[in-house]
Design a protein with these regions (language model features):
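N-terminal export leaders
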Residues: 9-10, 34-35, 53
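Intrinsic-disorder-associated, low-complexity terminal segments enriched in Asp/Asn/His/Tyr and depleted
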Residues: 27-28, 52
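Active-site beta->alpha loop and helix N-cap motifs at the rims of alpha/beta catalytic domains
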Residues: 67-77, 81-209, 217-219
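Catalytic alpha/beta core domains of metabolic enzymes, predominantly
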Residues: 193-194, 205-304, 309-312
Length: 363
């Protein structure tokens, strides 16, 4: 019943905008003007404005009706993989997980884009999954990346994660080989039917070269193990279509899109900036959930420049690793073919961190 009410609400107010929203940039940075007088989608779609806290709380409650994997709502952090002398630095990795546990995050997501999974060997990938589960020790959920452009390989990694004790698996769309929508459906279906843990479909067409269309995601939602969507297309329209038709737990895959996505029924974020300031991103989500839109807007504005430069100065995870080193939490260099941040960009990032109020070591 809750899902039916939520779907009716979203269908009434979200899909029929008067005009298209501004397109996202390559790095999916959503314009701050979206929030100047309340989310544009509210202004275009609602017959009356939300004017008081009671109305806001009612509005928030409608958007937050139970979704399929509600235990993953909130802040998840896309973990970096620390290296030392070219090898995985297990000690520093455990330290980063302890840092997130103390911050009270909902979930950690190792071996994804931020964790440099494309440059890990198969053995290293499995080792990071196992170390994550061991270090988390039940203090937070663990959702490792297990995707591949080979369905058989994705199934193997997902089965390993499930056997190791992962709470869910984050499965990126197949990259490089550009399957059809039917191929994408069959890929995720095969993975979902191979394990008994929830699957989060990760849609990031800027990296994979193929968008998983809303119609395909809606088809996938009919499968019991498909429970979540990591939404990194930059399209509010696409997210709205999925939210209106399914009870999937939708998580933002772009830090700067967290508040816009929450505003249409998203339930949280898988965050890169959470490696630096998990408390602020967690506070943004909690403020929205409590109906304190003014505080949520303030935190969005505070985080915006930091989020923009972590995703815009160079390919992720180059800037986040540089930033962590600058504030005294060094996780080593990135692996080739990625290279360290160039000096002028490093100087800019150092200034961004200092302006944010983070303790930056001198160059």
């Amino acid at each position: 019943m809750a899902f039916i009410l939520r779907r009716r609400f979203l269908r009434r107010f979200l899909p029929r905008h008067a005009s298209p929203l501004p397109p996202a940039t390559e790095n999916h940075i959503f314009p701050w003007s979206f929030f100047r007088a309340g989310p544009a989608i509210w202004r275009q779609s609602r017959p009356v404005a939300v004017r008081d806290s009671a109305q806001m709380q009612t509005f928030g409650a409608l958007l937050q009706m139970s979704t399929r994997a509600e235990q993953f709502a909130g802040l998840s952090v896309a973990m970096v993989t620390p290296f030392r002398d070219g090898a995985i630095d297990t000690r520093r990795f455990h330290e980063q997980i302890d840092f997130q546990a103390k911050a009270g995050v909902t979930c950690i997501c190792p071996v994804g884009t931020t964790g440099e999974s494309p440059t890990l060997t198969h053995d290293e990938h499995e080792r990071v999954i196992a170390e994550s589960i061991q270090a988390a020790a039940g203090r937070m959920l663990v959702m490792p990346g297990t995707g591949s452009n080979s369905t058989a390989e994705a199934i193997r990694l997902t089965k390993f994660a499930a056997k190791a004790g992962a709470n869910a698996a984050l499965v990126v769309g197949p990259y490089y080989n550009r399957p059809t929508q039917q191929g994408l459906y069959e890929h995720f279906k095969a993975i979902a039917e191979s394990v008994d843990i929830p699957i989060c479909v990760y849609n990031i067409p800027a990296r994979t070269g193929r968008n998983i269309e809303p119609e395909t995601i809606i088809r996938l939602a009919s499968l019991p193990r498909i429970a979540m969507l990591k939404e990194a297309t930059g399209s509010i329209d696409q997210a709205s279509q999925v939210l209106a038709a399914t009870d999937l737990t939708v998580l933002s895959g772009d830090d700067s899109m967290t508040l816009p996505l929450l505003a249409i029924g998203g339930r949280g974020v898988i965050s890169v900036v959470g490696n630096l300031v998990p408390a602020d991103m967690k506070a943004l989500i909690q403020a929205f959930e409590k109906g304190d839109l003014a505080k949520a807007r303030m935190l969005h504005g505070k985080l915006f420049t930091l989020c923009r430069d972590l995703l815009g100065l160079a390919s992720n995870p180059i800037p986040i690793k540089a930033a962590m080193a600058m504030i005294g939490r060094d996780t080593g260099d990135v692996r080739l073919p990625l290279v360290s941040l160039e000096a002028p960009l490093a100087d800019k990032l150092r200034q961004v961190l200092a302006d944010y109020g983070l303790p930056v070591a001198k160059a």
